[in-house]
Amino acid sequence: MPWFGAHLSIAGGLRKAVEAAVRLRMDVFQIFTHSPTRWHVPERASNSAGRRRRAESTVSVEPGYLPFSLEDAQAFRLAWKQAGMQPPVVHASYLINLASRHSDLWKRSVAAMIAEMHAASALGAWGVIVHPGSPTTDTEAKGIRRVVRAVDRVLAASPSDVQLVLETTAGQGASLGSSFEQLARIIDESSHSQRLAVCFDTAHVFAAGHPLSTADDCRETLDRFDRTIGLDRLAVFHLNDSLEPFGSKKDRHEHLGRGQIGVEAFRCLVNDPRFARLPMCMETPKGTENGVDCDEINLRLLRSLLK
């Protein structure tokens, strides 16, 4: 059976996410390490961003990279382990743009990503999910080359126990990651490809123009992903329905089974034996309905689809 969970808030402290995951009987969960709309770029991460480390295996977590104390990180690790949960995954800040044509933003993004990787390692998280970014008015090819350079610099300066996970995107504007070919190129051209993986976001994939709404659609899209990138690179799912129609290039999430994708895609994914030991995290709207947490409602639906 896949590991079900959701993105959870760390407002009030890291432990709050673990407490919410336990309350909702999740197997796994995703968090931000700090506010996703604010930069966290420690000086030492900025210094590391400007050069490559010679031996990746020698890189260890350093407190100066972290947006929290080592004591809080240790308490967090102990809490999710004692709860019997799978290791969490971190989502990087929305401000990071590894494809940026602007040198200052690119360097700042690399430094911020290095800090995210150190933070994830301190928390016992196995990976950091990041959107590849946008070259804006520059060409796709140049944007991809910049992402490859950024990824290699980040991984050379990051603890080796954390993977960098490229997320599929909806294709809004000039953002990279909406085509499987783009992600494959980044992975193939990286000198650290063994530490790169992919997050398959259902809402993004659907909005980008990859069909998912029927079981046949789902299998066809997964087969194309396998031929282009390889299912061995697929490390985590974001299970989200889409408020926007197929091929819209718009990123707006909806509760599972209530959007344009529909329930069959999720039935297909949760019952595919190839994904029986993969994390599946929801990023659906938060809130309550009739006094019931919306994450609980969506989790109930997922569990009801299991055969």
Predicted regions and their residues:
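A short, acidic, amphipathic alpha-helical segment used as a generic capping/interface helix at domain edges
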Residues: 219-230, 260-274
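Conserved, mostly hydrophobic/aromatic
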Residues: 21, 91, 109, 120, ...
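C-terminal helical cap(s) of enzyme catalytic domains, especially alpha/beta-barrels
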Residues: 289-307
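Active-site acidic/histidine proton-transfer and metal-coordination neighborhood
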Residues: 81-82, 97-197, 294
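Acidic/histidine-rich catalytic cores of soluble enzymes
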Residues: 148-256
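Active-site beta-loop-alpha junctions enriched in small/polar residues
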Residues: 7-11, 32-36, 93-95, 133-135, ...
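Short, well-ordered coil/turn segments that N-cap beta-strands
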Residues: 1-4, 25-27, 82-88, 122-126, ...
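N-terminal pre-domain/capping segments
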Residues: 1-92, 96, 100-118
